[in-house]
């Protein structure tokens, strides 16, 4: 496979977004993907890009400001849930989420600017 038109984002910032071993979106999934990709040689045939954080203005384009503030507060407290019981809060979830959102926005932006053909953000 030789496809430099595909960019894969990975970095430890994205790996911080996860909800523990018991949750389907555990923090170990990104590291497992990276190990498998390197093992298969995928990292040598695509462009690798670093994660990027978004700002609060980006977040409130989708979420109500009160919810963004609540997530930031829950991130400091480090417990409770961000929704009806499926998304646990943990210390640092706000900043981890900013990297997930910012990376997705950066990938879309680069594609729309015709710098890349495809991008892959392995987080969900």
Name the predicted role of every residue range.
Residues 1-124:
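HDAC/HDAC-like amidohydrolase catalytic core signature
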